Amino acid sequence: MSNVFVQQPAIQKLLRDSAGLDVAGGDERFKAIIHRLLENICTLIDDYNVTEEEFWHAVNYLHELGGRQEAALLAAGLGLEHFLDLRQDAIDAAAHRETGTPRTIEGPLYVAHAPLAEGHARMDDGADAGEAMWLHGEVKDTEGRPVANAIVDIWHANTLGNYSFFDPGQSEYNLRRRIRTGADGRYSVRSIMPSGYGCPPDGPTQKLLDRLGRHGNRPAHIHFFVSAPGHKHLTSQINLNGDKYLWDDFAFATRDGLIADPVKVTDREIIAQRNLEGEHTEVCFDFTLCKALSADEEQRGIRVRAKE
């Protein structure tokens, strides 16, 4: 068949009735979105001659996806979360908005209300014998001036690629901290070097990726929310240079301007200044925040998050 079938009056009436287009009340924009979605699905079924067995397999897949709580993971893996970033970049460019540090995907593993420290904190609880990391940088505005009272919200995986809260083997808020900058705009944390990770091998996201001939791996990376009064909230993450998946991230999060170069520190004076036991890796990354045009721009986007 061709999409002429979907355009038949009986099918079009079914789609309009299903979306409530001719029913008073409800949300008109939402109705229009659902109508477009249903029409596109029906056209796809007709164009690709999707069988009943394939249709119900897809319905069951949605059950499995929700049961494993992997919907957000799949959204990242199919590039939809990255698409939102690219679209917002285009909107900002069309409006001639000033740019700072690039945005990139949040991912599904943020947990709200991490402990807040002034200027510096230790992120790890000492249970993971990973390589020590000293992460630091400066928050600046677009004129290069330090931003005081910025909140740098940081989270990353352990050496096994797992995140606290979602991994019952880790302590609460392990590898999660918020740092408030001082007048110098600087932040620093002691932590451990994170590992990249792969999608759960038995999960629905990896099952779909297998059908596409794709892997489900991410490079080692560190997540950030950076916010400050009067400035546009930034959601971003940095990927660590040298990882084999740096430019082959299944979640499409790697972007120019968001790659950090880990540096091995062996200088005993620096080690002593940082109160570390020995050699460690230093990661330096500065952030540039843009001015907010409204109070809403100072806040992170609304979505379901753990403990929020």
What residue ranges belong to the model's regions?
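Beta-strand-dominated extracellular/periplasmic modules and repeats
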Residues: 2-308
